[in-house]
């Protein structure tokens, strides 16, 4: 998992509340168990006018030329609600997104995102709306998300503070998932195992 310290990137927005995981990655694309290859199906029902995904929806924000290459997504409250599919953060990350900014997230989606190196940032409704307004007003608008300083800097230079659990921050800063955490403690685990008694049948 790639570490997340500070990221500056082009921002795109989906001005909708309650964006659920079935919209993020529809159920027909969940057959894979590896994390790659989901980006093309991200927001499939909104991005495409046909089932095959051959006809892009020209009115959907992620299809607009001005947002090509966006790496920060801004949305409204309760982002990631619905089923607990881990494929949702996989699809967002595979598309190239590094951070999602919203007033609130579904709890399971929030945890799944952190576990997969995608930073979910909670800001107030007012702060999120300001970011959306600034991004809409200026093509190429970039936002900086600094996990070390726990700040978000808007295109105009306004700085907003956010909070995240210390353990989640540590894992993201160091690029540690569950396996990485276990490997980081390999010596302690080995010492503990060496102390275990050997039982004979």
Swiss-Prot record:
One of its GO terms (cellular component) is 3-isopropylmalate dehydratase complex. Gene3D superfamilies: Aconitase, domain 4 (3.20.19.10). GO terms for molecular function: 3-isopropylmalate dehydratase activity. It catalyses: (2R,3S)-3-isopropylmalate = (2S)-2-isopropylmalate. Transmembrane segments: none annotated. Pfam families: Aconitase_C (PF00694). Its EC number is 4.2.1.33. Keywords: Amino-acid biosynthesis, Branched-chain amino acid biosynthesis, Leucine biosynthesis, Lyase. One of its GO terms (biological process) is L-leucine biosynthetic process. Pathway: Amino-acid biosynthesis; L-leucine biosynthesis; L-leucine from 3-methyl-2-oxobutanoate: step 2/4. It is an enzyme of class 4 (lyase). The keyword Protein transport does not apply. Belongs to the LeuD family. LeuD type 1 subfamily. Catalyzes the isomerization between 2-isopropylmalate and 3-isopropylmalate, via the formation of 2-isopropylmaleate. Heterodimer of LeuC and LeuD. This is 3-isopropylmalate dehydratase small subunit. The gene is leuD.
